[in-house]
From Swiss-Prot:
The keyword Ion transport does not apply. Belongs to the peptidase S1 family. Kallikrein subfamily. One of its GO terms (molecular function) is serine-type endopeptidase activity. Its EC number is 3.4.21.35. The gene is Klk12. Kidney and submandibular gland. One of its GO terms (cellular component) is extracellular space. It comes from Rattus norvegicus. Keywords: Disulfide bond, Glycoprotein, Hydrolase, Protease, Serine protease, Signal, Zymogen. PANTHER family: KALLIKREIN-1 (PTHR24271:SF47), KALLIKREIN-RELATED (PTHR24271). Residues 25-256 form the Peptidase S1 domain. The active site is at H63 (charge relay system), D118 (charge relay system), S211 (charge relay system). Residues 19-24 form a propeptide. This is Glandular kallikrein-12, submandibular/renal.
C-alpha cells in the first residue's frame, strides 16, 4: 500500500513545499545504512522529511502542512524491501500557532517574508516499533554553537534546479554559521528562532524535498530544515533551519496534552 502511495507522489513530481523547503541534499553522500534511524519520510502531496522524537510523534516543517499524511520509518532506500521499514498513518497535525498560515499554501519566497516558527508535530495513529533501524532522538537541551559540525539528511534532489532524486538517503556535512551571515545572504527575515547553516563557498546544502528533516550538530538534534535560496548550494547563500531549542517547551506541551 505505501509503495503505491509513494509511486503516486513521485509520478506527479516529487516536490516539497518549495522554496521555504528548497531543501534537497546537494554535495552530499549516501548515508551509512541505519545511521539515521530517526529519519522519517513524510508523504502527502509532496515529499518532506521528518524526525521521530517519540514513538508516537514526528516533528517536521509547518510549510509541509497538508490534510493527509503517511510516514515511512526505518528506511534507507525508499523503494527496496528493507527489514526495519515501517509505515504509519498520521491522525493529527499541530503546526506551530505562530507560523504564518499563508505560507502553508503559498511557497514562494518574497523579500521581507518572515518564516519564523516553521515547525509542526505529527501524531501517529499507532506508535512506531523501536528497533535497531527505528529510534527516537532527544530534543536539544543546550544552544548550538557557531562553528559546530552538523549533518543534514534527506531523499531529495542532488543537483540544483534538476529533478534528480536518489533512492537512498543522502547526508551532507555543513557548519553552523552566525545568523548575521544569513541576514547578509537573504532578503527574507532571519530571526532568533532560526539557525544559519551551510558552507559559504557553496556546493553543499539542503534543498527541495528535505524540508522538515533533521539537522544534527555534534550529534545533537538542533534544527529542522526550513528554507534557503534558489537554486540551493550557491556561494554565500547558507540555508535556514528552525532552531529547536527555542521550541522545546511548546513541543513537550503539545505532546503531553494530546497523547
Amino acid at each position: 500500500m505505501w509503495l503505491q502511495i509513494l509511486f503516486l507522489v513521485l509520478s506527479v513530481g516529487r516536490i516539497d513545499a518549495a522554496p521555504p523547503g528548497q531543501s534537497r541534499v546537494v554535495g552530499g553522500y549516501k548515508c551509512e545504512k541505519n545511521s539515521q534511524p530517526w529519519q522519517v519520510a513524510v508523504i502527502n502531496r509532496y515529499l518532506c522529511g521528518g524526525v521521530l522524537i517519540d514513538p508516537s510523534w514526528v516533528i517536521t516543517a509547518a510549510h509541509c502542512y497538508s490534510h493527509n499524511y503517511h510516514v515511512l520509518l526505518g528506511r534507507n532506500n525508499l523503494f527496496k524491501d528493507e527489514p526495519f521499514a515501517q509505515y504509519r498513518v498520521v491522525n493529527q497535525s499541530f503546526p506551530h500557532p505562530d507560523y504564518n498560515p499563508f505560507f502553508m499554501k503559498n511557497h514562494t519566497l518574497f523579500p521581507g517574508d518572515d518564516h519564523s516558527n516553521d515547525l509542526m508535530l505529527l501524531h501517529l495513529s499507532e506508535p512506531a516499533d523501536i528497533t535497531d533501524g527505528v529510534k527516537v532522538i532527544d530534543l536539544p537541551t543546550e544552544e548550538p554553537k557557531v562553528g559546530s559540525t552538523c549533518l543534514a539528511s534527506g531523499w531529495s534532489s542532488t543537483k540544483p534546479l534538476e529533478w534528480e532524486f536518489p533512492d537512498d538517503l543522502q547526508c551532507v556535512n555543513i557548519n553552523i554559521l552566525s545568523n548575521e551571515k544569513c541576514i547578509k545572504a537573504h532578503t527574507q527575515m532571519v530571526t532568533d528562532v532560526m539557525l544559519c547553516a551551510g558552507e559559504l563557498e557553496g556546493g553543499k546544502d539542503t534543498c527541495n524535498g528535505d524540508s522538515g528533516g533533521p539537522l544534527l550538530c555534534d550529534g545533537v538534534l538542533q534544527g529542522i530544515t526550513s528554507w534557503s535560496s534558489v537554486p540551493c548550494g550557491e556561494t554565500n547563500r547558507p540555508a535556514i533551519y528552525t532552531k529547536l531549542i527555542k521550541f522545546t517547551s511548546w513541543i513537550k506541551e503539545v505532546m503531553k496534552e494530546n497523547s
